[in-house]
């Protein structure tokens, strides 16, 4: 696997939150996973800061892909810190695993989505492999450990069929609490 330096730089620019990962090796693996996805994707960093974060909420959604992804990471981090404050002995949260998993949860969407007629759509690849699967594949190519790949694999509906780690529960709920209200909230 040969990742071009410009994609590593782009990943770092998209994700200042990478600096929250204290383990240098995990930070590098997480950065490289995003860089590999950018290198293989038809989407550019500009696209990620422009396109809606989901295809499931209609054409008028204004929250961007990166806006949502970064919000999920911030919410997950805040939640993990509070859980460690109140439950450290009974339910400890590994903050590096949590943050890396939150950053990588939707990395597979870079392979799932395409741009057609100026709009993001699910591409042919995405019809066969949803982003939890392609995200794990990208992460494993970059040496991301199993406990982080578990978060990628289980953050979406596919994870409802298995037991989740504490960190995976946090990322799952951070993601869905900032998605479902856009799709399903009571509108008054």
Q: What are the language-model segments listed below?
A:
Residues 59-62, 123, 128, 132, ...:
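Short alpha-helical interface elements
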Residues 87-89, 93, 98-99, 136-140, ...:
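Histidine/acidic-rich helix-loop-helix segments that form or flank divalent-metal centers
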Residues 119-141, 169:
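Divalent-cation-assisted or electrostatically stabilized phosphate/pyrophosphate-binding catalytic cores
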Residues 1-120:
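Acidic/His-rich, divalent-metal-binding segments that scaffold phosphate/diphosphate chemistry
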